[in-house]
A protein has these predicted regions:
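N-terminal module-boundary/linker segments of secreted carbohydrate-active enzymes
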Residues: 26-71
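Bacterial N-terminal signal peptides that target proteins for export
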Residues: 1-10
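Surface cap/lid and interfacial helix-loop subdomains adjacent to catalytic sites
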Residues: 151-170, 191-353, 357, 389
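Active-site-proximal beta-strand/loop segments in catalytic clefts of secreted hydrolases
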Residues: 88-91, 130-134, 179-180, 208-212, ...
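Sec/Tat signal peptide C-region and signal peptidase I cleavage site
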Residues: 20-25
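Gly/Ala-rich beta-loop-alpha elbow adjacent to hydrolase catalytic centers
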Residues: 178-182, 186
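Active-site catalytic motif of lipid deacylating hydrolases and related acyltransferases
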Residues: 42, 48-51, 77-81, 87-173, ...
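Bacterial N-terminal signal peptides
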Residues: 10-19
């Protein structure tokens, strides 16, 4: 199947509800589902006890200024953070079966977890389980079948979270971090384990990007969750941050059905929290990936600065280039990203993050691939403030 065709089907599967914990039928109905042993450190991508911790690698960045000059931004993890972060990665596996195995691929789970989550180690202990997610090929094989599944992706995430609680939490506050399929699984986890239950008192926040958290119009709770509210400020603890990103010049709407930001009915709306400025427009503190290993359908790495080629750090910052605001057009509620390009200076005038089909931007996806990295610095700062608010309440 051509890349353009599987991306089309992938999008249709998302629209049909794929990212929810309900997944696809697997031809193993007569077999008992064997539980993953989360006492085995090899079943964690990120874990304080894992010597091969994916989140333990260097996440230093090169700052590319508006004049094209560059400077190094070093990074260190907090050796004794007061809270924990539990992360569930998005749909990324290219394993050929419907469900991913427990052997993470470098170009899929490993790089995704590294780019989306490792930087949080500056504010929290990092836990990221390997789980048997629905794979990208699995979406294609089962795009028309959303019933009679064994929900192993959700079962794995719930078991990993409960293992963390029983063996590592010790009453500490925690942040849940997810994207896309990971977000949908965390939505189910919050509903089943946290919302309105004693464990809610330990929730510092939940960052649920790249999928829909729904509330009644004008409300902060009562849709996806009965009691866990949406965040209304950067320093608020015990709440949910959620958003999906689109370019300002390619907004959702018009022809075609866009994948993110649309509420299920006219009485509700999808959450949009702007990490750059919850009250309006603000500058995105992006940590853009400078890792050259990409799959087809993603634009090549830009030349960050023609005046300083050869940047080698895993991340690049472009201060002043990117800003964002939440837009609600009555149908879609989304995070609009603007680029302050200046063709006269040597710095890049664009970023990569769109899904490409046959070399053209596939508009319904928006900037889904970089939802997290676009606001990474903002999110880490917010978690730091939320941790302080949590400790002081």
């Amino acid at each position: 199947m051509r890349y353009s065709e599987w991306m089309r089907i992938f999008g249709l599967a998302l629209l049909a509800g794929l990212p929810l914990a309900s997944a696809f039928a697997q031809e193993v109905e007569s077999e008992a589902l064997e539980a993953v042993d989360y006492g085995d450190i090899d079943n964690w991508l990120c874990h304080p006890g894992n010597t091969l911790d994916v989140c333990g690698h260097d996440v230093s960045a090169t700052i590319v200024n508006a004049d094209g000059s560059v400077e190094l931004e070093a990074w260190t993890a907090d050796p004794d953070p007061g809270i924990d972060c539990f992360y569930v990665y998005p749909t990324t596996s290219l394993d050929e079966d419907t469900w991913a195995d427990l052997h993470p691929g470098r170009h899929e789970e490993v790089i995704t977890a590294f780019t989306q989550f490792a930087r949080f180690k500056s504010v929290c202990r990092a836990f990221a389980p390997v789980y048997r997610q629905i794979t990208i090929p699995g979406l294609l094989m089962n795009a028309g079948n959303l019933a009679n599944n064994d929900q192993r992706n959700y079962i794995d995430v719930a078991n990993a979270f409960n293992h963390y609680l029983e063996n590592h939490n010790d009453g500490r506050g925690f942040v849940l971090v997810g994207h896309s399929q990971g977000t949908s699984l965390l939505i189910e986890l919050i509903r089943n384990e946290i919302d309105g239950r004693p464990l809610q008192d330990q929730l510092v926040s939940a960052i649920l990007a790249g999928n829909s958290v729904v509330v009644p119009k004008g409300e902060v709770a009562g849709g996806s969750f009965s009691e866990v509210p949406l965040c209304e400020s950067a320093g608020q603890a015990g709440c949910v941050i959620s958003y999906a990103t689109y370019r300002d010049n390619i907004p959702p709407g018009g022809e075609g059905l866009f994948l993110f930001g649309r509420a299920p009915n006219e009485d509700s709306e999808v959450a949009c929290f702007n990490p750059a400025n919850p009250g309006g427009e603000g500058e995105l503190d992006a940590y853009l990936s400078n890792i050259g290993e990409i799959f087809q359908g993603v634009a090549p790495m830009p030349v960050w600065s023609s005046a300083a080629p050869g940047i080698s750090t895993p991340f690049v910052k472009v201060p002043g280039l990117l800003s964002a605001r939440c837009v609600n057009d009555g149908t879609y509620h989304y995070l609009e990203v603007s680029i302050a390009a200046d063709p006269a200076d040597p710095r890049t005038d664009d970023i990569r993050g769109d899904v490409l089909i046959d070399g053209q931007i596939n508009a319904p996806w928006g900037l889904h691939l970089i939802d997290m990295t676009l606001a990474m610095g903002n999110l880490v700062d917010i978690v730091r403030m939320q941790a302080e608010a949590y400790a002081g309440r």
